[in-house]
Amino acid sequence: MKDNNIENIVTLELVKEDELYKFKKDLQESFSVAVIEEFGSVDAGPIPSDEEIEKSFNAPGAVIYHILSNGIKVGGVVVSINEETQHNSLDFLFIAKGKGGKGIGYKTWKAIEEKYPETKVWETHTPFFEKRNIHFYVNKCGFKIVEYLSEKYNNPDEEGLPGG
């Protein structure tokens, strides 16, 4: 029997070039769970799209990490760091299916903040139907909601997100 009281030690490890394909697929699998729960299926292709992920991977200042809990890969994170302005972006954060609910997400966020202490502003986004994510970012991590986008109120510079 496993001891559920063992503390998770969360660390970040840079993703290697030859790991990007699997990282992308793991990210899409993780994100698809909420879409299927909300809408019943993922009809429009992988969520997020390959193009959206590649755009994030190739953005200026992009840094891609595996999330490790006690040395085992349990998820990943993509951040974009602007060394000049220190207005940085959390582009993707995911915990693999079955690995959540153990404080790993919050410990990951704290590890990111520790890694980038000069950051003045962090920005992120999540679909409106992702109530767990909204709770996590606002109530656990301290983000503030400054903009609400949906089909009715969207960002003309970006393609629509499912449910957003």
Labelled PLM ranges:
Residues 10-25:
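A short beta-loop-alpha structural element at the N-terminal edge
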Residues 31-53:
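Conserved GNAT-fold acetyl-CoA-binding loop/helix
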Residues 48-66, 75:
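A short helix-loop-beta-strand connector motif used in the catalytic cores of GNAT acetyltransferases and
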Residues 64-66, 72-81, 89, 94:
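Conserved beta-strand in the GNAT
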Residues 93-100, 126-128:
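A short, internal acetyl-CoA/4′-phosphopantetheine-binding micro-motif in the GNAT/acyltransferase core
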Residues 95, 101-114, 139:
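Conserved acetyl-CoA-binding loop-helix of GNAT-fold acetyltransferases
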Residues 114-128:
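Conserved GNAT acetyl-CoA-binding A-motif
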Residues 125-127, 139-163:
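Conserved catalytic-core motifs of GNAT/GCN5-like acyltransferases
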